[in-house]
Amino acid sequence: MDMDKIDVPNGYALSAGTSTIFLNSSVAYDTNADWITGANSIRFNNGDGLYDDVRTSNNGDGGGLGPVYAGYSCGSCHRNAGRTKPTLWENGGSGNYGFSSMLVYISRRNGAFFRDYGRVLHDQAIYGVKPEGKLSVTYDKQTFSFPDGETYELCKPNYTITEWYKDSIAPEDLFCTVRIPLRHVGMGQMMAIDRREIEALAAKSNYPEYGISGRCNYITEKGVTGVGLSGNKAQHLDLTVELGFSSDMGVTNSRYPEEICEGQAQINQGSMMGLSYDQLDISTADMEDVDLYMQSLGVPARRNINDPQVILGEQKFYEAKCHLCHVTTLHTQAGGSTLLNGTRLPWLGGQTIHPYSDFLLHDMGSEIMGVGLNDNYVSGLARGNEWRTTPLWGIGLQEKVNGHTYFLHDGRARNLTEAIMWHGGEGEASKNLFKQMSKEE
């Protein structure tokens, strides 16, 4: 276990209260909080196994993959409970086929889904079945300069889909947006946050001198309307365990009992190969264990808090007004969070946490290189140019855990500097303040 450079905790170093863990290693995202004991420890380990298990197309336990799919396990995209490198970047952005670590959402230009595809394009399929399509990408690169003359690049992706399983869709009628997985750090703490505190932040998130005004994304799921916290656009009320199994892997469950390719020729091909579609691929109890696993992961403590460079960086973080959106401190509600079956995790309640996010929607601009971070994709109340403030806890360990430093929703930023320089709209003022800093700062 790598314990180097772990400081004695104080102040903001305790990222998640009693769920804070003191690890600086490749398993820093994938380790349970200390309060997981007894029967919950057994369930945590079962959920961990199900999260990483490679699904097969066979009937029965561990099966149900496909017939078409985007990933073969939760861990194939959320490696070590983190985020995998965008595959197409890994191959130089040359248009390489396959995006096992990327999800592509497609629709018509008017927002309607394509009848034969649904909302997610599945580029992989089991033997004997044709994938729905293949994605390729090119990058428009533009060079900019800091005041001291040092240059940086911003790379705007352009996506093309070919090899449609059915009739080709004309580019002028097609809209697509790409995602790489989010880190699963602090999921339980996020679900336990008192929503009234988020609404209070929205009410006071009005800083006209910096152009900042955040708002909640109100979502209705399972007949309940509330403040969305989960997802790039805060478009979900829970961790979407059932949706992930169904939409990403084709694994049917009690909430999504139909195959994702229902109505396509692929489902008939699967039947001819002896696959059964009349039973669910994963039990509700197993999904609840995956949910427990995700909500029980610890959050790495802040590191090197006494390092002079870290202290200077924190000072500049506030001077650049990053904290107006990346809010330092929030609180969890007294009862903790809730699992899929309604069971509460009271250990997550009554905690002071430091996610560095307000979990609100903010306009991230539409003018950098022509489009900024506007993907034209609407999620609930979130418009195309609006994104949830990304929590920053654990972000400094991403390279150690996942082996890369790609950031933003589609991985276009190759490091944190590029991620900051992509900020437009409500992030424009902070970006410009950052740009004026010296290299040391």
Regions found by a protein language model. Give the residues of each.
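Extracytoplasmic redox metalloprotein regions
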Residues: 19-43, 50-287, 291
